[in-house]
Amino acid sequence: MAKLSKIAQAKRKPKFSVRQYNRCPLCGRPRAFLRKFKMCRICLRNRALRGEVTGVTKSSW
């Protein structure tokens, strides 16, 4: 319940622009947000493994 209210709160335009923070649009996670992909690291990893994110490959050496 608290997570849903935080997601709704993050979608609203804040009173001051510095109060705005990034949140994953898929799962609502506030931490480990990657601006380049606009999602959290966990969602990015899941989508990259399924091949839904172009240009991302699993590294191996």
Curated annotation (Swiss-Prot):
S-S bridge residues: none
Pfam families: Ribosomal_S14
GO cellular component terms attached to this protein's record: cytoplasm; small ribosomal subunit
UniProt keyword Ribosomal protein, yes or no: yes
Cofactors that this protein relies on: Zn(2+)
Binding site for Zn(2+): C24, C27, C40, C43
Coiled-coil zones: none
BP GO terms, sorted: translation
Keywords, ordered alphabetically: Metal-binding, Ribonucleoprotein, Ribosomal protein, RNA-binding, rRNA-binding, Zinc
Function as written in the Swiss-Prot or TrEMBL entry: Binds 16S rRNA, required for the assembly of 30S particles and may also be responsible for determining the conformation of the 16S rRNA at the A site.
Family: Belongs to the universal ribosomal protein uS14 family. Zinc-binding uS14 subfamily.
Quaternary assembly: Part of the 30S ribosomal subunit. Contacts proteins S3 and S10.
UniProt protein name: Small ribosomal subunit protein uS14B
Species in which this protein is naturally found: Myxococcus xanthus (strain DK1622)
